[in-house]
Amino acid sequence: MEFDFAELPAQDRYRLLVSFVAPRPIALVTTVDAHGCNNAAPMSFFNVFSQEPPLVILGMQTRPDGTVKDTVANIKRSGEFVVHMVDMSIAQEMIVTGINFPSDIDEIEFAGLTSVPSVKVTPPRIKEAPCAMECRVAQTIDYERRTIVLGEVVQMHVRDECLDERGRYVRPEVYQPIARLHADNYIVADRQFVLKKPTDLLHHEEAAGYGERKPEKLPG
C-alpha cells in the first residue's frame, strides 16, 4: 500500500505513524505554572536525541480548540521541565495525569504521586519514578498545531535498584519501562535479546576510521 501524506487526512497520518513507529517510550513531564501549581502530563512523542549535548525531544499538540496545553505554556514561560520514565509501578498513576484537568489541579497530587524538589530546576520531580531528568529548554519549534521542544538534561535521578552496584549498567530485570503502541495499547520492555555485528565485517569500520572495536564487558 502507498500513502501520499499530502492527500491524507491528519487523523489517518496519525494512525499510520503511531501504529508503525512503535513502541514509543512514555515521558511523564512535570512543570510549574506562574502561580506555583504543579502540572504533570504523559506524552509518547518523546525520545532521547543526543548525548553531546544531552538532549531529549518532546512533541506536544494543542487542545482540540487550538489553545496551548498547560505543559507547553509552562515550559515556554519558565524554560524548565522534568521528564520521568514510567514503569509498571506508576503506570496507572501516569494514566490519571493524562486526564484534561483544569489548570489549577495538581496532577501529581491528584494521581497519588509524591513530588520532591529538583536539584537544578524549579519543577518538582516525582519520587516514585524509576528515572527523572531535569531539563532546561534548548530550543522550541512551533507549528500550527504542535510544539517541538528540545530540552538539555542538566541533572538525572535514578532509582538505586535500577543500576548495578557500580551505577554503570541498567539491571533489565528491574528496570522495565512501559511504552505506547497505539490507542490504549502499551507494552513492557521485559524481553531482551542480543544482536551483534558480524566480526568478519568489522574491518570495514576500522578502515573508515572508527579504530579497532573492543567488545564492552557486560556485568556478571
Feature-to-residue mapping (PLM):
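Basic, polyanion-binding surface patches
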Residues: 1-220
